[in-house]
Design a protein with these regions (language model features):
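N-terminal intrinsically disordered, low-complexity, charge/repeat-rich segments that act as generic
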Residues: 1-44, 56
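Short beta-strand micro-motifs in enzyme catalytic cores
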Residues: 5-7, 74, 112
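Well-ordered beta-strand positions in beta-sheet-rich domains
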Residues: 25-29, 63, 88, 113
Length: 122
């Protein structure tokens, strides 16, 4: 059975952040199946439960919705507009379990990798 979870993503090591940055990332409330994979059917059933919070330097810089778009793409929409603020890179294939890495692509095409810092059922 799919449950909703709070998933914390923190910026992983990259140029300019050789140790990563736990104060830069996303808090996501998302439906995960028993294997830790995103469940699009569960999100379509309860879309109001899919939330995203973007933080930088520990401060909230945006909040919005987790959505599944055309072709199954996972979208982080921080301003409730039509355009994605970030797209999950192959999120449908990823497992959201602590210690795993996932990538997000910004509208500019810039891509960043995040570590799944924690996953807690809500």
């Amino acid at each position: 059975m799919t449950q909703f979870h709070h998933v914390r993503l923190e910026l992983a090591r990259e140029a300019g952040h050789p140790a990563g940055d736990p104060t830069d990332g996303y808090d996501i409330v998302a439906p995960l199946d028993a294997d830790g994979r995103l469940d699009g059917d569960a999100l379509r059933t309860e879309p109001e439960r899919g939330h995203v919070r973007r933080f930088s330097r520990g401060e909230t810089v945006g909040a919005g919705r987790l959505q599944q778009g055309p072709g199954g793409a996972w979208i982080l929409n921080l301003d409730d507009g039509e355009d994605a603020d970030a797209r999950g890179f192959r999120f449908s294939d990823e497992r959201f379990v602590a210690g795993e890495y996932v990538s997000l692509t910004l509208p500019s095409g810039e891509q960043h990798t995040y570590v799944v810092a924690r996953v807690v059922e809500v």
